């Protein structure tokens, strides 16, 4: 099964990087993520990464009171994702990995501009590629950006690394009777408004038959086990059976 899943894109939320602080970047979490990604690379898995920017600023929230226009707020959010991407690059390099950051917005003093052919070449050479600045356009989430990049680089799946071990029929943090959904179709994820990703991201994955895997990022070894085929540790959104 692993041979069919040799290239993946992992999506981390910006909030996850903040840890218990709720804001900024917790270097201990960066170090943990780096060790998890390193285990993938050591197992010949090509890895792309997208990180949100919510630990620094969220475009939607910044534009709520009307002082900052939504377009500008979203660009601010894109810059936040680049900050996180550079931090992750440092952590991965500290772990001994070869890493490139590619931004959808030109920031030539800091990182490469996104070129999908170059990204694929980096992956083929065993480098981890971190995609920053979302899609480069306002009004699109980093979930949508992650799905887009996964499709462009030919990833076999997109893994949404979260604080829970999959998708539930309701919030497991609030409801003790919440049931984990091991598998669900794209249509179910869209129609039931289950909080997997935003509708644009799910629809894009559906149109391109890209499996969405939701798992707990804080359990050591989870990412590798899931890529190697242990679906009991996650929820998988895919085509209707």
From Swiss-Prot:
Family per record: Belongs to the UMP kinase family.
Main enzyme class: transferase
Binding site for ATP: 11-14, 54, 58, 162, 168, 171
Pfam families registered for this protein in UniProt: AA_kinase (PF00696)
Activity regulation note: Allosterically activated by GTP. Inhibited by UTP.
Pathway info: Pyrimidine metabolism; CTP biosynthesis via de novo pathway; UDP from UMP (UMPK route): step 1/1
Residues annotated as binding UMP: 53, 74, 135-142
Keyword Secreted on entry: no
Major location (coarse): cytoplasm
Organism per entry: Wolinella succinogenes (strain ATCC 29543 / DSM 1740 / CCUG 13145 / JCM 31913 / LMG 7466 / NCTC 11488 / FDC 602W) (Vibrio succinogenes)
Gene name, Swiss-Prot/TrEMBL: pyrH
Keywords: Allosteric enzyme, ATP-binding, Cytoplasm, Kinase, Nucleotide-binding, Pyrimidine biosynthesis, Transferase
Reaction(s) catalysed by this chain's protein: UMP + ATP = UDP + ADP
A molecular function (GO) term: ATP binding
Record carries keyword Nucleotide-binding: yes
UniProt-recorded name of the protein: Uridylate kinase
The protein's Enzyme Commission number: 2.7.4.22
InterPro entries with a match to the protein in the record: AceGlu_kinase-like_sf, Asp/Glu/Uridylate_kinase, Uridylate_kinase, Uridylate_kinase_bac
Taxonomy of the source species: Bacteria, Pseudomonadati, Campylobacterota, Epsilonproteobacteria, Campylobacterales
Record Gene3D superfamilies: Acetylglutamate kinase-like (3.40.1160.10)
Stretch list, region Involved in allosteric activation by GTP: 19-24
């Amino acid at each position: 099964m692993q041979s069919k899943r040799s290239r993946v894109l992992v999506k981390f939320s910006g909030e996850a990087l903040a840890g218990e602080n709720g804001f900024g970047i917790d270097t201990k979490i960066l170090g943990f993520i780096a060790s998890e990604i390193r285990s993938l690379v050591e197992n010949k898995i090509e890895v792309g990464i997208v990180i949100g920017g919510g630990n620094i600023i969220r475009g939607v929230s910044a534009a709520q009171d009307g002082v900052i226009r939504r377009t500008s707020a979203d660009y601010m959010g894109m810059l936040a994702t680049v900050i996180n991407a550079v931090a992750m690059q440092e952590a991965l390099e500290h772990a001994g990995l070869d890493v490139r950051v590619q931004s959808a917005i030109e920031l030539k003093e800091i990182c490469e501009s996104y070129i999908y052919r170059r990204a694929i070449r980096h992956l083929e050479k065993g480098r981890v590629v971190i995609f920053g600045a979302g899609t480069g356009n306002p009004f699109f989430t980093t979930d949508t950006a992650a799905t887009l990049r996964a499709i462009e680089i030919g990833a076999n799946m997109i893994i949404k690394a979260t604080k829970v071990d999959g998708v539930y029929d309701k919030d497991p943090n609030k409801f003790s009777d919440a049931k984990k959904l091991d598998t669900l179709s794209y249509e179910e994820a869209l129609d039931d408004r289950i909080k997997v990703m935003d509708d644009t991201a799910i629809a894009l994955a559906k149109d391109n038959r890209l499996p969405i895997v939701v798992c707990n990022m804080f359990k050591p070894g989870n990412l590798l086990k899931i890529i190697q085929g242990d679906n009991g540790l996650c929820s998988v959104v895919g085509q209707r059976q």
